[in-house]
Amino acid sequence: MEGETVAYKFEILKGQDNLFYWRFRASNGEVMCSSDGYTAKASAKNAIESIQSNAPRAMIEDKI
């Protein structure tokens, strides 16, 4: 991926509380969504993989 522009990306970070978080960034750097804390990095990664797998089939539920 070197030299390639990635439009959107997930990031995994460790907070000052020692929990792991993910966030989803747009190509302009804006954080579009982020997670609650996970005690294990693998759990944060599993959540990302679940979103990547299931989001294309997710329905939009308008509650307004």
Specify the residue positions occupied by each region the protein language model found:
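Short, Lys/Arg-enriched N-terminal segments with co-localized hydrophobic residues
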Residues: M1-T5
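Generic structural motif recognizing short loop/turn segments at the entrances and edges of beta-strands
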Residues: V6-K9, P56-A58
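A structural feature that tracks compact, well-ordered secondary-structure segments
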Residues: Y8-Y38, S43-I51
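Short arginine-rich
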Residues: S50-E61
